Amino acid sequence: MTTIISVRRNGHVVIGGDGQATIGNTIMKGNVRKVRRLYYNDKVIAGFAGGTADAFTLFELFERKLESYQGHLVKAAVELAKDWRTDRRLRRLEALLAVADENASLIITGNGDVIQPEKDLIAIGSGGPYAQSAARALLENTNFSAREIVKKSLVIAGDICIYTNQFHTIEELTSTAEGY
């Protein structure tokens, strides 16, 4: 359980996440880095919601796909989703990935889904609905930067969701896509 949010605005794409890891109802760690840069020269940012070990496995597999497809985000995401859905070992992994590069923002699921959400706003995890609501309100009613919106959305989600804390990892790329 966690909160991962991605916002694209004014030539920037930002993904942020909290750092809480839980087992059942117990907080096991409060400073997990659920958002990281991937691929050559850190051209892709990715965040995960779900099992930590599963997510690190998926990060590694996704980075290999990015290398195989020369950094083409959509192709790498589709190929990862195919493998995730069809490979018996991978099917057991429970996580969602939010990934972005300068052109696209995607959600990758274990069901084989690769989704480019409307207006490139992604929110996943237990605190996702709270962060998404906050981000939409801020996008529609303020001139805040993508980074400010991600930060404020994570704070709001952390105040509401018991599986989200206030330790944040935030990564940013310059973007060519418009988003909100």
Curated annotation (Swiss-Prot):
Q: How is its activity regulated?
A: Allosterically activated by HslU binding.
Give its E.C. classification number.
3.4.25.2
Subcellular localization is given as: Cytoplasm
UniProt family annotation? Belongs to the peptidase T1B family. HslV subfamily.
Cystine links in this protein are none
Enzyme superclass (EC): hydrolase
State what protein this is by name.
ATP-dependent protease subunit HslV
Q: Does the keyword Protease apply?
A: yes
Q: Where does Na(+) bind?
A: 158, 161, 164
PANTHER family membership: ATP-DEPENDENT PROTEASE SUBUNIT HSLV (PTHR32194:SF0), METALLOPROTEASE TLDD (PTHR32194)
Q: Does the keyword Protease apply?
A: yes
- GO CC annotation, single: HslUV protease complex
Transmembrane ranges? none
User: What is catalysed by this protein?
Assistant: ATP-dependent cleavage of peptide bonds with broad specificity
Main localization is cytoplasm
Q: What role is this protein assigned?
A: Protease subunit of a proteasome-like degradation complex believed to be a general protein degrading machinery.
GO BP term, pick one: proteolysis involved in protein catabolic process
Active site residues according to the UniProt entry: 2
Question: What organism is listed for this UniProt entry?
Answer: Baumannia cicadellinicola subsp. Homalodisca coagulata
In its UniProt record, a GO molecular function of this protein is:
threonine-type endopeptidase activity
Under CDD domains, the record lists:
protease_HslV
